[in-house]
Amino acid sequence: MVRDQAESLRLRVKKMQHETETKAIAVLSGKGGVGKSNVSLNFSLALRQRGKNVLLFDMDIGMGNIDILLGQTSSHTIIDIFRPNVTIHDIIKTGPENLSFIAGGTGLTDIFHMDEQKVQYFIEQLQLVSEQYDYIIFDMGAGMSEDRLQLLKAVDDIFIVTTPEPTALTDAYATMKYIHLADHQLPIYVLVNRARSDKEGIETLQRLKQVAKRFLGKELHALGYVPEDRTVSNAVIRQTPFLLFDPSAKASKAVIQMTERYLANEEHKEQMKRPFHFFAKLRQYFLER
């Protein structure tokens, strides 16, 4: 009896230690068409190349394209998890670099816009596999809703992808303001995609940081910028992630730098980071309302 209790305690401690190490990241944009999914995918692959176990979750339900960017046909999507005799193990697929991913689907407006029993089941299924991964990355759809906000409040970090265009910047600021007002402690990282020059990329990042600091009192973390690069469009046509299509391309090098910058920042704040309560927060926000 004592031995069983001791073993149970060890397992609980081990699980808590792992949960402290596992991180949930949500990647989003204020508007569609800024290359968010491409950034999510290639960032995930760059993490894999650095020895991190990653689950990339296509949450752009109804318009998901991670599987298309990978050139893979998925027999199951996230909506299948609610079908009889289908578990999360059935819908997780393996891509290049042994990247685990879950494809989006059609016919479901919002995965959390459903009854409590299904939400509970979804959370339990995701938690079932979470111990295998260092990072769970949610590639979110464009736009905001109250239910999506609850998911964002539960993750550890927010990545906002934008382009230098004024409309994209306006939407990016509106998105970060919405999130900041809901949880001012949530770390927000910004990435400028398709910068036409180094000057444009740097100035766009500086402008976003200054505006957030002045009007929100928010310190943004700059991930960097990805330059406009024909390699990206060529890779999309070939249905191959550009990081693998041409590792020496400017866009590929930028994603590598962005990944290394993020990991270095993670090491720097290792002593300060809060315990991982992602699943506890999901339950709190979705099941205890």
What are these regions (language model features)?
Residues M1-K31:
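Extreme N-terminal, non-catalytic leader segments
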Residues A24-I88:
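Walker A/P-loop NTP-binding active-site region of P-loop NTPases
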Residues G30, T163-P164, I188-I202, Y225-V232, ...:
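G-domain G4 guanine-recognition motif of GTPases
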Residues M59-E131, V236-R238:
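P-loop/Walker-type NTP enzyme "switch/lid" segment
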Residues I123, L169-H184:
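Conserved C-terminal guanine-recognition region of P-loop GTPase G domains, centered on the G4
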Residues Q125-Q132, S145-T167:
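Inter-motif core of Ras-like GTPase G domains
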Residues L216-L243, A254-Q257:
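Beta-strand-loop-alpha "switch" segments that mediate conformational coupling across diverse proteins
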Residues P241-R289:
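NTP-binding/hydrolysis catalytic cores, primarily Walker-type P-loop NTPases
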